[in-house]
Amino acid sequence: MNSIPSIISKHKAYFAAGHTRPLESRLNILRKLKQAVRTHEADLIAALYQDLHKSEQEAYSTEIGIVLEEISFVMKRLRKWSKPKRVKTPLTHLGSKSIIIPEPYGTVLVIAPWNYPLQLALSPLIGAIAAGNTVVLKPSEYTPAVSAILSKLISSVFPTDYVAMAEGGPDVSTALLQQPFDYIFFTGSVAVGKIVMEAAAKQLIPVTLELGGKSPCIVHKDADIQLAAKRIVFGKFTNAGQTCIAPDYLFVHEDIKTKLTEEMKRAIREFYGPQPERNPQYGKIVSERHYQRLLSFLNDGIPLTGGQSDPNHHKIAPTILEQVRDDSPVMQEEIFGPILPLFTYRNIGEVIEKVQSRPKPLALYLFTTNKEIERAVLGNLSFGGGCVNDTLMHVATPYLPFGGVGESGIGSYHGFDSFNTFTHKKSVVKQTNRFDFAFRYPSSKNGLRMIRKILK
Protein backbone atom coordinates (compact mmCIF):
# COMPACT_ATOMS: atom_id res chain seq x y z
CA MET A 1 0.00 0.00 0.00
CA ASN A 2 2.99 2.27 0.43
CA SER A 3 3.36 2.20 -3.35
CA ILE A 4 -0.16 3.50 -4.04
CA PRO A 5 0.72 7.22 -3.81
CA SER A 6 3.68 6.56 -6.12
CA ILE A 7 1.42 4.83 -8.66
CA ILE A 8 -0.99 7.77 -8.67
CA SER A 9 1.86 10.26 -9.02
CA LYS A 10 3.28 8.38 -12.01
CA HIS A 11 -0.15 8.13 -13.62
CA LYS A 12 -0.71 11.85 -13.29
CA ALA A 13 2.70 12.56 -14.82
CA TYR A 14 1.99 10.14 -17.69
CA PHE A 15 -1.34 11.85 -18.33
CA ALA A 16 0.18 15.34 -18.11
CA ALA A 17 2.78 14.34 -20.70
CA GLY A 18 -0.06 13.83 -23.18
CA HIS A 19 0.57 10.14 -23.92
CA THR A 20 -3.09 9.12 -23.56
CA ARG A 21 -4.74 11.82 -25.65
CA PRO A 22 -3.88 11.28 -29.35
CA LEU A 23 -6.81 9.60 -31.07
CA GLU A 24 -4.69 7.13 -33.02
CA SER A 25 -2.91 6.08 -29.82
CA ARG A 26 -6.24 5.41 -28.12
CA LEU A 27 -7.50 3.38 -31.07
CA ASN A 28 -4.27 1.43 -31.19
CA ILE A 29 -4.30 0.57 -27.49
CA LEU A 30 -7.95 -0.53 -27.69
CA ARG A 31 -7.03 -2.74 -30.64
CA LYS A 32 -4.25 -4.31 -28.55
CA LEU A 33 -6.64 -4.81 -25.65
CA LYS A 34 -9.12 -6.63 -27.88
CA GLN A 35 -6.40 -8.90 -29.19
CA ALA A 36 -5.17 -9.61 -25.66
CA VAL A 37 -8.66 -10.65 -24.55
CA ARG A 38 -8.79 -13.06 -27.49
CA THR A 39 -5.32 -14.37 -26.71
CA HIS A 40 -6.22 -15.04 -23.08
CA GLU A 41 -9.72 -16.36 -23.83
CA ALA A 42 -9.05 -19.97 -22.82
CA ASP A 43 -7.34 -18.91 -19.60
CA LEU A 44 -10.18 -16.52 -18.78
CA ILE A 45 -12.79 -19.24 -19.31
CA ALA A 46 -10.84 -21.58 -17.02
CA ALA A 47 -10.46 -18.85 -14.37
CA LEU A 48 -14.16 -17.94 -14.48
CA TYR A 49 -14.98 -21.59 -13.91
CA GLN A 50 -12.51 -21.86 -11.06
CA ASP A 51 -13.85 -18.78 -9.25
CA LEU A 52 -17.59 -19.02 -10.03
CA HIS A 53 -18.22 -22.29 -11.91
CA LYS A 54 -19.34 -20.38 -14.98
CA SER A 55 -19.87 -22.65 -17.96
CA GLU A 56 -17.98 -21.84 -21.15
CA GLN A 57 -21.18 -20.55 -22.77
CA GLU A 58 -21.98 -18.33 -19.81
CA ALA A 59 -18.39 -17.12 -19.53
CA TYR A 60 -18.29 -16.08 -23.16
CA SER A 61 -21.82 -14.68 -23.49
CA THR A 62 -21.83 -12.66 -20.26
CA GLU A 63 -18.16 -11.73 -19.93
CA ILE A 64 -15.72 -12.20 -22.80
CA GLY A 65 -18.12 -11.60 -25.69
CA ILE A 66 -19.59 -8.51 -24.04
CA VAL A 67 -16.10 -7.02 -23.65
CA LEU A 68 -15.09 -7.77 -27.25
CA GLU A 69 -18.31 -6.25 -28.58
CA GLU A 70 -17.89 -3.16 -26.41
CA ILE A 71 -14.37 -2.56 -27.76
CA SER A 72 -15.56 -3.01 -31.36
CA PHE A 73 -18.49 -0.65 -30.84
CA VAL A 74 -16.33 2.06 -29.27
CA MET A 75 -13.55 1.82 -31.86
CA LYS A 76 -15.96 2.26 -34.78
CA ARG A 77 -17.30 5.50 -33.31
CA LEU A 78 -14.45 6.98 -31.30
CA ARG A 79 -13.24 9.26 -34.08
CA LYS A 80 -16.65 10.93 -34.26
CA TRP A 81 -17.11 11.12 -30.49
CA SER A 82 -13.71 12.74 -29.99
CA LYS A 83 -14.29 15.67 -32.33
CA PRO A 84 -15.06 19.11 -30.90
CA LYS A 85 -18.75 19.80 -31.45
CA ARG A 86 -20.11 23.09 -32.79
CA VAL A 87 -23.38 24.13 -31.16
CA LYS A 88 -25.76 27.00 -31.77
CA THR A 89 -24.94 30.48 -30.53
CA PRO A 90 -27.65 32.89 -29.31
CA LEU A 91 -28.24 36.35 -30.78
CA THR A 92 -26.61 37.89 -27.71
CA HIS A 93 -23.34 36.32 -28.90
CA LEU A 94 -23.63 37.42 -32.52
CA GLY A 95 -20.40 36.85 -34.43
CA SER A 96 -19.04 34.20 -32.09
CA LYS A 97 -18.75 30.40 -32.25
CA SER A 98 -19.71 27.98 -29.48
CA ILE A 99 -17.76 24.74 -29.16
CA ILE A 100 -17.87 21.74 -26.83
CA ILE A 101 -14.47 20.08 -26.52
CA PRO A 102 -14.40 16.56 -25.02
CA GLU A 103 -11.41 16.13 -22.73
CA PRO A 104 -10.42 13.32 -20.35
CA TYR A 105 -10.61 13.83 -16.61
CA GLY A 106 -7.12 12.49 -15.91
CA THR A 107 -6.49 9.52 -13.63
CA VAL A 108 -9.49 7.27 -13.00
CA LEU A 109 -10.07 4.68 -10.28
CA VAL A 110 -12.20 1.68 -11.29
CA ILE A 111 -13.31 -0.58 -8.43
CA ALA A 112 -14.74 -3.79 -9.88
CA PRO A 113 -16.92 -6.45 -8.20
CA TRP A 114 -16.62 -10.23 -8.09
CA ASN A 115 -19.85 -11.36 -9.80
CA TYR A 116 -18.76 -10.52 -13.36
CA PRO A 117 -15.07 -10.01 -12.65
CA LEU A 118 -13.95 -9.61 -16.26
CA GLN A 119 -16.82 -7.67 -17.81
CA LEU A 120 -17.32 -5.26 -14.91
CA ALA A 121 -13.58 -4.54 -14.75
CA LEU A 122 -12.93 -4.05 -18.46
CA SER A 123 -16.17 -2.39 -19.61
CA PRO A 124 -15.61 0.82 -17.61
CA LEU A 125 -11.88 0.63 -18.37
CA ILE A 126 -12.68 0.63 -22.10
CA GLY A 127 -14.67 3.85 -21.72
CA ALA A 128 -12.00 5.49 -19.60
CA ILE A 129 -9.21 4.61 -22.05
CA ALA A 130 -11.32 5.64 -25.06
CA ALA A 131 -11.80 9.05 -23.46
CA GLY A 132 -8.04 9.44 -22.90
CA ASN A 133 -7.61 8.75 -19.17
CA THR A 134 -5.16 6.65 -17.23
CA VAL A 135 -6.71 3.96 -15.02
CA VAL A 136 -6.00 2.27 -11.71
CA LEU A 137 -8.06 -0.92 -11.60
CA LYS A 138 -8.99 -2.55 -8.29
CA PRO A 139 -10.38 -6.08 -8.92
CA SER A 140 -12.23 -8.10 -6.30
CA GLU A 141 -10.26 -10.26 -3.91
CA TYR A 142 -13.03 -12.89 -4.14
CA THR A 143 -12.09 -13.92 -7.69
CA PRO A 144 -8.31 -14.51 -7.50
CA ALA A 145 -8.07 -16.75 -10.57
CA VAL A 146 -9.65 -14.13 -12.83
CA SER A 147 -7.58 -11.37 -11.23
CA ALA A 148 -4.38 -13.28 -11.98
CA ILE A 149 -5.23 -13.60 -15.68
CA LEU A 150 -6.49 -10.03 -15.80
CA SER A 151 -3.19 -8.82 -14.38
CA LYS A 152 -1.25 -10.66 -17.11
CA LEU A 153 -3.61 -9.33 -19.76
CA ILE A 154 -3.36 -5.72 -18.59
CA SER A 155 0.43 -5.79 -18.26
CA SER A 156 0.75 -7.20 -21.79
CA VAL A 157 -1.11 -4.20 -23.24
CA PHE A 158 -0.49 -1.13 -21.09
CA PRO A 159 2.54 0.51 -19.50
CA THR A 160 2.08 0.47 -15.71
CA ASP A 161 1.94 4.28 -15.72
CA TYR A 162 -1.08 4.03 -18.06
CA VAL A 163 -3.12 1.22 -16.49
CA ALA A 164 -2.17 -0.36 -13.17
CA MET A 165 -3.75 -3.14 -11.12
CA ALA A 166 -4.11 -2.62 -7.37
CA GLU A 167 -4.93 -6.01 -5.87
CA GLY A 168 -5.96 -6.74 -2.30
CA GLY A 169 -8.83 -6.49 0.15
CA PRO A 170 -10.79 -3.63 1.74
CA ASP A 171 -7.59 -2.09 3.13
CA VAL A 172 -6.35 -1.50 -0.43
CA SER A 173 -9.69 0.03 -1.43
CA THR A 174 -9.55 2.31 1.60
CA ALA A 175 -6.03 3.43 0.73
CA LEU A 176 -7.01 4.07 -2.89
CA LEU A 177 -10.00 6.19 -1.85
CA GLN A 178 -7.64 8.53 -0.01
CA GLN A 179 -5.78 9.37 -3.22
CA PRO A 180 -6.44 12.43 -5.42
CA PHE A 181 -8.08 10.68 -8.37
CA ASP A 182 -9.84 12.74 -11.01
CA TYR A 183 -12.77 10.31 -11.28
CA ILE A 184 -14.01 7.21 -9.43
CA PHE A 185 -16.11 4.45 -10.97
CA PHE A 186 -17.48 1.90 -8.50
CA THR A 187 -19.60 -1.21 -9.00
CA GLY A 188 -20.86 -2.97 -5.89
CA SER A 189 -23.29 -2.82 -3.00
CA VAL A 190 -25.29 0.17 -1.83
CA ALA A 191 -23.53 0.08 1.55
CA VAL A 192 -20.03 0.25 0.07
CA GLY A 193 -21.22 2.75 -2.55
CA LYS A 194 -22.05 5.17 0.26
CA ILE A 195 -18.52 4.75 1.66
CA VAL A 196 -17.04 5.45 -1.78
CA MET A 197 -19.18 8.54 -2.25
CA GLU A 198 -18.31 9.86 1.21
CA ALA A 199 -14.59 9.46 0.52
CA ALA A 200 -14.93 11.09 -2.91
CA ALA A 201 -16.88 14.01 -1.45
CA LYS A 202 -13.98 14.92 0.82
CA GLN A 203 -11.90 15.70 -2.28
CA LEU A 204 -14.81 16.69 -4.57
CA ILE A 205 -14.04 13.80 -6.92
CA PRO A 206 -16.87 13.02 -9.36
CA VAL A 207 -18.23 9.47 -9.18
CA THR A 208 -20.28 6.91 -11.02
CA LEU A 209 -21.88 4.38 -8.70
CA GLU A 210 -23.29 1.19 -10.20
CA LEU A 211 -25.13 -0.34 -7.27
CA GLY A 212 -28.14 -2.64 -6.97
CA GLY A 213 -31.38 -3.15 -5.10
CA LYS A 214 -34.44 -5.34 -5.25
CA SER A 215 -35.46 -5.54 -8.90
CA PRO A 216 -39.07 -6.67 -9.39
CA CYS A 217 -40.42 -8.90 -12.14
CA ILE A 218 -44.13 -8.69 -13.02
CA VAL A 219 -46.03 -11.30 -15.03
CA HIS A 220 -49.51 -10.22 -16.08
CA LYS A 221 -52.25 -12.69 -16.95
CA ASP A 222 -52.01 -12.07 -20.72
CA ALA A 223 -48.28 -12.91 -20.92
CA ASP A 224 -46.86 -15.71 -23.04
CA ILE A 225 -46.45 -18.01 -20.05
CA GLN A 226 -44.01 -20.53 -21.49
CA LEU A 227 -41.72 -17.84 -22.90
CA ALA A 228 -41.95 -15.73 -19.75
CA ALA A 229 -41.00 -18.73 -17.61
CA LYS A 230 -37.88 -19.48 -19.66
CA ARG A 231 -36.76 -15.86 -19.73
CA ILE A 232 -37.31 -15.37 -16.00
CA VAL A 233 -35.41 -18.56 -15.16
CA PHE A 234 -32.60 -17.44 -17.47
CA GLY A 235 -32.45 -13.96 -15.95
CA LYS A 236 -32.69 -15.08 -12.35
CA PHE A 237 -30.44 -18.13 -12.25
CA THR A 238 -27.63 -17.13 -14.63
CA ASN A 239 -24.46 -16.96 -12.50
CA ALA A 240 -26.48 -18.59 -9.68
CA GLY A 241 -28.48 -15.39 -9.28
CA GLN A 242 -25.38 -13.31 -8.52
CA THR A 243 -26.32 -10.58 -10.98
CA CYS A 244 -27.10 -7.01 -9.95
CA ILE A 245 -29.99 -6.80 -12.43
CA ALA A 246 -31.43 -10.27 -11.79
CA PRO A 247 -35.14 -10.42 -10.92
CA ASP A 248 -35.13 -10.20 -7.13
CA TYR A 249 -38.78 -10.95 -6.48
CA LEU A 250 -41.71 -11.98 -8.64
CA PHE A 251 -45.28 -10.69 -8.93
CA VAL A 252 -47.58 -13.11 -10.77
CA HIS A 253 -51.24 -12.51 -11.57
CA GLU A 254 -53.23 -14.94 -9.46
CA ASP A 255 -54.97 -16.42 -12.52
CA ILE A 256 -51.72 -17.81 -13.96
CA LYS A 257 -49.64 -18.65 -10.89
CA THR A 258 -49.93 -22.43 -11.25
CA LYS A 259 -49.26 -22.44 -14.99
CA LEU A 260 -46.28 -20.10 -14.69
CA THR A 261 -44.62 -21.93 -11.81
CA GLU A 262 -45.01 -25.29 -13.58
CA GLU A 263 -43.36 -23.82 -16.68
CA MET A 264 -40.57 -22.36 -14.53
CA LYS A 265 -39.93 -25.76 -12.95
CA ARG A 266 -39.75 -27.25 -16.44
CA ALA A 267 -37.32 -24.55 -17.57
CA ILE A 268 -35.08 -25.12 -14.53
CA ARG A 269 -34.90 -28.84 -15.33
CA GLU A 270 -34.23 -28.09 -19.00
CA PHE A 271 -31.44 -25.61 -18.26
CA TYR A 272 -29.76 -27.20 -15.23
CA GLY A 273 -30.95 -30.81 -14.97
CA PRO A 274 -32.90 -32.64 -12.23
CA GLN A 275 -30.29 -31.79 -9.56
CA PRO A 276 -28.87 -28.35 -10.38
CA GLU A 277 -26.84 -28.24 -7.18
CA ARG A 278 -24.91 -31.26 -8.51
CA ASN A 279 -24.48 -29.85 -12.01
CA PRO A 280 -20.85 -28.80 -12.63
CA GLN A 281 -22.06 -26.28 -15.23
CA TYR A 282 -24.32 -24.47 -12.75
CA GLY A 283 -22.78 -21.52 -10.91
CA LYS A 284 -21.52 -21.59 -7.34
CA ILE A 285 -21.88 -19.03 -4.57
CA VAL A 286 -18.73 -16.97 -4.31
CA SER A 287 -17.91 -17.41 -0.59
CA GLU A 288 -18.86 -19.32 2.55
CA ARG A 289 -20.26 -16.17 4.17
CA HIS A 290 -22.48 -15.39 1.20
CA TYR A 291 -23.52 -19.06 0.99
CA GLN A 292 -24.62 -19.12 4.65
CA ARG A 293 -26.45 -15.83 4.23
CA LEU A 294 -28.45 -17.26 1.32
CA LEU A 295 -29.21 -20.49 3.18
CA SER A 296 -30.76 -18.43 5.98
CA PHE A 297 -33.18 -16.88 3.46
CA LEU A 298 -34.63 -20.32 2.74
CA ASN A 299 -36.32 -20.13 6.15
CA ASP A 300 -38.34 -17.08 5.09
CA GLY A 301 -40.84 -19.02 2.96
CA ILE A 302 -41.90 -22.37 1.57
CA PRO A 303 -39.92 -23.67 -1.43
CA LEU A 304 -42.24 -24.24 -4.36
CA THR A 305 -39.24 -25.79 -6.05
CA GLY A 306 -35.57 -26.04 -5.13
CA GLY A 307 -34.09 -25.47 -1.71
CA GLN A 308 -31.42 -28.16 -2.05
CA SER A 309 -27.79 -27.25 -1.49
CA ASP A 310 -24.26 -28.62 -1.79
CA PRO A 311 -22.02 -27.28 0.99
CA ASN A 312 -18.88 -28.76 -0.55
CA HIS A 313 -19.21 -26.59 -3.65
CA HIS A 314 -21.26 -23.68 -2.26
CA LYS A 315 -24.21 -24.41 -4.55
CA ILE A 316 -27.91 -23.76 -3.97
CA ALA A 317 -30.49 -25.11 -6.39
CA PRO A 318 -32.74 -22.59 -8.18
CA THR A 319 -35.44 -21.89 -5.61
CA ILE A 320 -38.87 -20.29 -5.83
CA LEU A 321 -40.21 -19.27 -2.41
CA GLU A 322 -43.88 -18.66 -1.64
CA GLN A 323 -45.69 -17.61 1.54
CA VAL A 324 -43.05 -14.92 2.06
CA ARG A 325 -43.85 -11.93 4.27
CA ASP A 326 -42.92 -8.42 3.13
CA ASP A 327 -41.05 -7.83 6.39
CA SER A 328 -39.00 -11.06 6.25
CA PRO A 329 -35.19 -10.80 5.88
CA VAL A 330 -35.26 -12.09 2.28
CA MET A 331 -37.36 -9.04 1.35
CA GLN A 332 -35.28 -6.50 3.25
CA GLU A 333 -32.10 -6.65 1.16
CA GLU A 334 -30.94 -7.57 -2.31
CA ILE A 335 -30.83 -11.38 -2.45
CA PHE A 336 -27.96 -11.80 -4.92
CA GLY A 337 -28.45 -15.53 -5.22
CA PRO A 338 -30.69 -18.24 -6.72
CA ILE A 339 -33.73 -17.59 -4.50
CA LEU A 340 -36.86 -15.97 -5.96
CA PRO A 341 -39.73 -14.93 -3.63
CA LEU A 342 -43.11 -15.13 -5.38
CA PHE A 343 -46.20 -13.02 -4.72
CA THR A 344 -49.58 -13.02 -6.43
CA TYR A 345 -51.73 -10.02 -7.28
CA ARG A 346 -55.22 -9.29 -8.54
CA ASN A 347 -54.77 -5.85 -10.15
CA ILE A 348 -51.70 -3.98 -11.36
CA GLY A 349 -52.36 -1.08 -9.00
CA GLU A 350 -51.39 -3.31 -6.05
CA VAL A 351 -48.04 -4.05 -7.66
CA ILE A 352 -47.31 -0.43 -8.52
CA GLU A 353 -48.09 0.63 -4.95
CA LYS A 354 -45.81 -2.04 -3.44
CA VAL A 355 -42.89 -1.27 -5.75
CA GLN A 356 -43.30 2.46 -5.10
CA SER A 357 -43.00 1.82 -1.36
CA ARG A 358 -39.45 0.51 -1.81
CA PRO A 359 -36.22 2.25 -2.92
CA LYS A 360 -35.94 2.69 -6.68
CA PRO A 361 -34.57 -0.55 -8.18
CA LEU A 362 -31.75 -0.99 -10.67
CA ALA A 363 -34.00 -3.01 -12.99
CA LEU A 364 -37.63 -3.91 -13.60
CA TYR A 365 -39.13 -6.58 -15.83
CA LEU A 366 -42.70 -6.74 -17.11
CA PHE A 367 -44.33 -9.54 -19.09
CA THR A 368 -47.52 -8.45 -20.84
CA THR A 369 -49.04 -7.79 -24.25
CA ASN A 370 -51.43 -5.20 -22.81
CA LYS A 371 -50.37 -1.67 -23.80
CA GLU A 372 -52.34 -0.10 -20.94
CA ILE A 373 -50.60 -2.31 -18.37
CA GLU A 374 -47.25 -1.47 -19.98
CA ARG A 375 -47.98 2.27 -19.85
CA ALA A 376 -49.15 2.05 -16.24
CA VAL A 377 -45.99 0.27 -15.07
CA LEU A 378 -43.45 2.23 -17.13
CA GLY A 379 -45.19 5.53 -16.44
CA ASN A 380 -45.57 5.15 -12.67
CA LEU A 381 -42.45 3.31 -11.57
CA SER A 382 -38.91 4.68 -11.52
CA PHE A 383 -36.05 2.23 -12.12
CA GLY A 384 -32.61 2.21 -13.72
CA GLY A 385 -33.51 0.17 -16.80
CA GLY A 386 -35.33 -2.98 -17.76
CA CYS A 387 -37.25 -5.02 -20.29
CA VAL A 388 -40.78 -5.68 -21.43
CA ASN A 389 -41.22 -9.41 -22.13
CA ASP A 390 -37.62 -10.28 -21.28
CA THR A 391 -34.97 -10.06 -18.55
CA LEU A 392 -31.36 -8.83 -18.48
CA MET A 393 -31.16 -8.05 -22.21
CA HIS A 394 -31.19 -4.25 -21.84
CA VAL A 395 -27.70 -4.52 -20.38
CA ALA A 396 -26.39 -6.16 -23.57
CA THR A 397 -27.06 -3.31 -26.02
CA PRO A 398 -24.35 -0.64 -26.34
CA TYR A 399 -26.95 1.80 -27.66
CA LEU A 400 -28.62 2.12 -24.24
CA PRO A 401 -27.11 3.76 -21.16
CA PHE A 402 -26.87 1.40 -18.20
CA GLY A 403 -27.16 2.75 -14.68
CA GLY A 404 -29.32 3.15 -11.62
CA VAL A 405 -31.49 5.79 -10.04
CA GLY A 406 -31.78 6.75 -6.39
CA GLU A 407 -30.21 4.09 -4.17
CA SER A 408 -29.55 1.82 -7.16
CA GLY A 409 -26.87 4.10 -8.53
CA ILE A 410 -25.60 7.39 -9.89
CA GLY A 411 -24.56 7.85 -13.51
CA SER A 412 -24.47 5.43 -16.42
CA TYR A 413 -22.16 3.83 -18.99
CA HIS A 414 -21.94 1.45 -22.00
CA GLY A 415 -21.28 2.56 -25.57
CA PHE A 416 -21.29 6.33 -26.01
CA ASP A 417 -22.32 6.78 -22.40
CA SER A 418 -19.04 5.16 -21.29
CA PHE A 419 -17.06 7.68 -23.32
CA ASN A 420 -19.32 10.44 -22.05
CA THR A 421 -18.98 9.39 -18.41
CA PHE A 422 -15.20 9.64 -18.46
CA THR A 423 -15.15 12.88 -20.47
CA HIS A 424 -15.36 16.46 -19.29
CA LYS A 425 -17.35 18.61 -21.70
CA LYS A 426 -15.27 21.78 -21.99
CA SER A 427 -17.35 24.71 -23.22
CA VAL A 428 -15.64 27.44 -25.25
CA VAL A 429 -16.95 30.62 -26.89
CA LYS A 430 -14.68 31.96 -29.64
CA GLN A 431 -15.57 35.63 -30.00
CA THR A 432 -15.14 37.77 -33.10
CA ASN A 433 -12.73 40.71 -33.23
CA ARG A 434 -14.44 42.28 -36.25
CA PHE A 435 -16.94 44.26 -34.18
CA ASP A 436 -17.94 44.86 -30.58
CA PHE A 437 -21.18 45.65 -28.74
CA ALA A 438 -20.64 48.79 -26.70
CA PHE A 439 -23.88 48.33 -24.73
CA ARG A 440 -22.40 45.40 -22.76
CA TYR A 441 -19.97 47.68 -20.93
CA PRO A 442 -20.88 49.72 -17.82
CA SER A 443 -19.84 52.98 -19.55
CA SER A 444 -22.58 52.65 -22.20
CA LYS A 445 -25.33 55.28 -21.86
CA ASN A 446 -28.01 53.11 -23.46
CA GLY A 447 -26.59 49.79 -22.29
CA LEU A 448 -29.33 48.83 -19.85
CA ARG A 449 -32.08 49.67 -22.35
CA MET A 450 -30.49 47.44 -24.98
CA ILE A 451 -29.86 44.63 -22.53
CA ARG A 452 -33.51 44.72 -21.43
CA LYS A 453 -34.61 44.39 -25.06
CA ILE A 454 -32.37 41.39 -25.67
CA LEU A 455 -32.67 39.52 -22.38
CA LYS A 456 -36.37 38.93 -21.85
From Swiss-Prot:
InterPro entries: Ald_DH/histidinol_DH (IPR016161), Ald_DH_C (IPR016163), Ald_DH_CS_CYS (IPR016160), Ald_DH_CS_GLU (IPR029510), Ald_DH_N (IPR016162), Aldehyde_DH_dom (IPR015590), Aldehyde_DH_NAD(P) (IPR012394)
Single GO term (MF): aldehyde dehydrogenase (NAD+) activity
Primary enzyme class: oxidoreductase
One of the GO biological process terms: aldehyde metabolic process
Keyword Ubl conjugation: no
Catalysis performed (reactions): an aldehyde + NAD(+) + H2O = a carboxylate + NADH + 2 H(+)
GO (cellular component) term, any one: cytoplasm
Keyword Ribosomal protein: no
Keywords: NAD, Oxidoreductase
EC number annotated for this UniProt entry: 1.2.1.3
Pfam families to which the protein is assigned, alphabetical: Aldedh
Active site per the UniProt annotation: E210, C244
PANTHER family xref list: ALDEHYDE DEHYDROGENASE, ALDEHYDE DEHYDROGENASE TYPE III, ISOFORM Q
Family: Belongs to the aldehyde dehydrogenase family.
Name of the protein described by the UniProt record: Putative aldehyde dehydrogenase YwdH
Organism: Bacillus subtilis (strain 168)
Gene name as annotated: ywdH
